[in-house]
Amino acid sequence: MELHEIAHARAKAWIEEMVALCAPDTVYVCDGSKKEYDTIMQKMVDAGLATPLKKRKNCFLFRSQPSDVARVEARTFIASKREDDAGPTNHWTDPAELKKTMTGLYSQCMKGRTMYVIPFSMGPVGSPISKNGIEITDSEYVVCNMHIMTRVGTRVLEALGTDGEFVPCLHSVGKPLGPGVTDAGQWPCADMERKYISHFPEERLVWSFGSGYGGNALLGKKCFALRIASVLARDEGWLAEHMLILKITNPAGKTKYIGAAFPSACGKTNLAMMIPTLPGWKVETVGDDIAWMKFGKDGRLYAINPEAGFFGVAPGTSDFSNKNAMDSIKENAIFTNCGLTEDGDVWWEGIGYPAKGTIIDWHGVSRPAPTRDKSPKGEEIAHPNARFTAPARQCPAIASNWEDPEGVPIDAFLFGGRRPSTVPLVHQARDWNHGVFLGSIIGSEVTAAVISDQVGQIRRDPFAMLPFCGYHMADYFSHWIKLGSQARAENLPKIFCVNWFRKDAEGNFLWPGYGDNSRVLAWIFDRCDGVDNAVETAIGWMPKEGALNTEGLNVSTQAVKELLSVDIAGWKKEIKDIRENHYPKFGARLPQQLRDALEVLEARINGSEGAACTRDMC
């Protein structure tokens, strides 16, 4: 399709305006075909940017610049009209000033390059929960990744018609080329101080400049699907969440759907693709990262995965930790900043086996292959944030209804962080507002391996949305409370807090995790059916003695008791930290319901309310 053939007048006018600003050599409107993908990928191979992998069919390896390896939160802006609306957790800048600065950067930024126009749908095309966008980019890497991560092409333009709503997303690597000049194998990006990932919430607009990395450049992902979509969800009465969606079926053939929000490094993708150790139980994947949810006609929350692929962290992914992910990336995948073995395969730390002979690291330097699947810190073969991009349909565990345009009905929400102490293996909120409270306080404890002067402190990441909420986080809490108040309690998902990362006094994990997390999911499954397998404690409902299936589990009775106990001293410290360090950040906009929940927790912990007490729980 040619630009002049686009029937949507507003989209066409915007694209033409961006062509005049960015001055590309040519303009190409993406049709979403396999031929298009193959042609553009070959262009990158010819330019020395992509390396075909001999061991994997239709797979390619890319290496970025060391300055362009991850999301850059310090260069990520929420440019709301009022600073207060961005809130304390976002970087705000004046939208008029930001546009002026970025317009200067965009001026002729695509000289020597092709401007690609990518019509894309977040979610199945035509779904009542889906939204459309158009990304303009000068990066072939972005085009090919968007082919995998979203639904791209002519069918999206057809769905838009002549006046459909869309989110405009402008992206440039910020590296124009002179006559006859190519990238010559060098990943194109701008210097750090010229990188901008900017969101204009009231305009539903994303502008990104200077980075080619996934989260900064694949604008359908965090920029649209979370930061802009969270604003849309607030205004339209739905939820856009940093959540996996899994389908779980018990031995009797009954199915439920669970949404789970965890901060980074807490095993979200592993849980979404889990292979249960409990006989007869089955877990299937609907999504591993983002969930969009709207209330259905029956009053229940229905969720879609707005993405079409997985953009996963490679290091640590192995047949042991996530076999389904490993099977998903055997073909038709893109790898970024991984090692390259001498026989033409990718490799990373934690892959489960050593490489042989020599290996090329993510810097492009040839080195002796490690004798184990580990490397000293700072000498990694693969960057710690090395990534794979793969179509979701290739996952062996993908649910047959993962693309149902009506979504799947959510029965439970899980919140959790990486907490070596205090927070038990699982507990259930007493009601919706208590669940919102639990979501608002999740986080991970800083360990000695991270930042030494903060050891023991809790790095809070409410709802795992800290880097992704497009407006004031306190208003986000209020939005959750409001949605709960508008629904019948029996229609709302039950809310649970989980913690796979409790440790004993010697620093050893008490819980094996991975497939054995199915034991916790089985208890949650039964709780959603109202099974009487819980006891009320000071912090919420917890498994009765013997309610958690530990058959065949190599965990001592004492460890299980510790995992399912309420640490009174730990919770008193937790309450103090929330009251003094966490909640004050949100000021007067913090919902009173959350202040009340904290008071109730303190009263229960102090024993002033007669919570039922068993097994040293309270």
UniProtKB/Swiss-Prot annotation:
Record field: catalytic activity: oxaloacetate + GTP = phosphoenolpyruvate + GDP + CO2
Highest taxon in the source lineage: Bacteria
Binding site for Mn(2+): K222, H242, D289
Compartment list: Cytoplasm
GO molecular function terms attached to this record: GTP binding; manganese ion binding; phosphoenolpyruvate carboxykinase (GTP) activity
Residues binding substrate, per UniProt: R71, Y213, G214, G215, S264, N385, A386, R387
Main localization category: cytoplasm
UniProt similarity note: Belongs to the phosphoenolpyruvate carboxykinase [GTP] family.
Self-association state and partner proteins as the record states: Monomer.
UniProt name for this protein: Phosphoenolpyruvate carboxykinase [GTP]
Organism, scientific name: Treponema pallidum (strain Nichols)
Gene: pckG
